[in-house]
Swiss-Prot record:
GO terms for cellular component: cytosolic large ribosomal subunit. One of its GO terms (biological process) is translation. InterPro entries: Ribosomal_uL11, Ribosomal_uL11_bac-typ, Ribosomal_uL11_C, Ribosomal_uL11_C_sf, Ribosomal_uL11_N, Ribosomal_uL11_N_sf. It comes from the Bacteria. One or more lysine residues are methylated. Belongs to the universal ribosomal protein uL11 family. GO terms for molecular function: large ribosomal subunit rRNA binding; structural constituent of ribosome. This is Large ribosomal subunit protein uL11. SUPFAM superfamilies: Ribosomal L11/L12e N-terminal domain, Ribosomal protein L11, C-terminal domain. Keywords: Methylation, Ribonucleoprotein, Ribosomal protein, RNA-binding, rRNA-binding.
Amino acid sequence: MAKKVQAYVKLQVAAGMANPSPPVGPALGQQGVNIMEFCKAFNARTESLEKGLPIPVVITVYADRSFTFVTKTPPAAVLLKKAAGIKSGSGKPNKDKVGKVTLDQVRQIAETKAADMTGASIETKMKSIAGTARSMGLVVEE
């Protein structure tokens, strides 16, 4: 028989840096999950990624207090900021441009995020990433 799901917990945790402090500790402690067990498993799964990169994770907590988790790809905005070499997006994206990204960089980000995005082709995913870039005040160059 399948385990009964008690809760889904969605968090963004820095790759390889999960620890029992907030936001991980309170969110999982509230559900009765062994926090250190999650931290060790998450850090082991994300050790190949760049340390400190925020990774969205969905934790499924079962009634017997066991858990499973699925890691997603980093948010598009984080990957775009890294590609453009900026700290943050523009406060006024239509007026103030803060950086530039090339179509090749947009394609690379779209391919990285392909598993988590909807859309039939890589071109539609690239359009979505380019839209995110424009909303951050980045110029997409040919």
